[in-house]
Amino acid sequence: MKAFETTIKPLVKFGEGSSLRAGEKFKLLGCTKVLAGYDANINPAVVDAVIGSIEKEGIEVVRYACSYSDGKDDGVIECRQLALDNKVDGFLAMGGGSTMDIVKAASLLVNVDLPEGAKSLVNYFVGHYNGPDLPRHAGLISIPTTAGTGAEATRSCIIASSALGVKATLSSQAAKADWVLLDPEMTKDLPPYFTAITGMDAIAHACEALCCTRSNIYTEMICGKSLELSWKNLPIVYKEPHNMEARANMSLAAYLALTGESYGNCGHSMAHAIGADFHVPHGHCCAWIAPVALYYTRNDCDHEIRLIARSFGLDDKSPTVAKDVANAMKQLVWSLGIKTPAEMGIKREDFIASAPKVMVDPIHLCCHTPLTEDKARELLGEVYDQKLYE
């Protein structure tokens, strides 16, 4: 049996209304002044309620309304500077994956020198930084407002680097929050489009974690359950946005998808490249790519793909199981009204030209089936064409 290790972080409070325990948790962490970073487009009443719970405990709050939807490095610099100027000892990361990653990164970088601003961030990205994990000397609580990105659960911060022209990763065990407040109420007003693409991001995370060189028995237990929940409940929340049982199941599925002590594969390398080149939301990219990435690993991940089939309620004994699963995923994407690359005005030749950036992203190195630039170009062509496998 393959070895693996787990960590106790983050601690999790799950359930409706759990976001209103933020003040209580910050007080337990000993925080006296908190930077609250949140999506600029969140309902102000929701923001006020969470911040009110913190202020009720006598904790001062500095607000940062994050307007960057793609984890842009400028947001990290802004958030970090605000934290330094106000000498905060706690961070609240509330929003979708981009905002959470910006706040997480800022919480790590307040203690390092960045003489060239956003350009200096390059020195701390995976592939450029060889030092020990960056520490965090302040409390950190994450509250996701979507069910899909899983950023609340991970040690990674995905940042759009203006210097590199790619989405890069800042990684540290300290990026994991002290507490995650997993409140389905925070997702109930999410528009159908964002419900769809964040849900597909969760499905992509779990599928890639299984079809990854780091996959293990723990991954199978955790990500198998995540897929069972997301496959059943994503179509429900898309059509019934205020179905709170389904919302709760999706919130849990998204969290579990990134807690299986595994990683990703070529799918997320392609999603990061396409997202950076065409400024398409990450979950939208994952919706296009996930079926193709899964089918690509079919010769090396037969056991895992059959597990995915079982989680989806498909015939795991089928001799064409990989094709069946990939096609079912494509049909789900289409049923959710997610536009194809062509429908978004992207040209095929431009799309496949992102292949070199796929190879720069290190996540593909964990793919069971090795990737080359020529193969990446071929896979991007399959993604663009959006056809069922025959």
Regions found by a protein language model. Give the residues of each.
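ATP/NTP phosphate-donor binding region
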Residues: M1-G90
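Structural motif
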Residues: L11, K33-L35, V62, D89-L92, ...
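Active-site nucleophile and cofactor-binding loops and adjacent substrate-binding regions
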Residues: Y68, M94-G96, H279-C285, I346
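Glycine/threonine-rich beta-strand-loop-alpha-helix active-site module
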Residues: D74-P184
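Carboxylate- and glycine-rich phosphate/diphosphate-binding segment that chelates Mg2+/Mn2+
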Residues: R155-S262, D374
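Active-site segments that bind and position negatively charged phosphate/pyrophosphate groups
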Residues: A209-A328
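C-terminal charged capping/lid subdomain of soluble metabolic enzymes
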Residues: A309, D315-E390
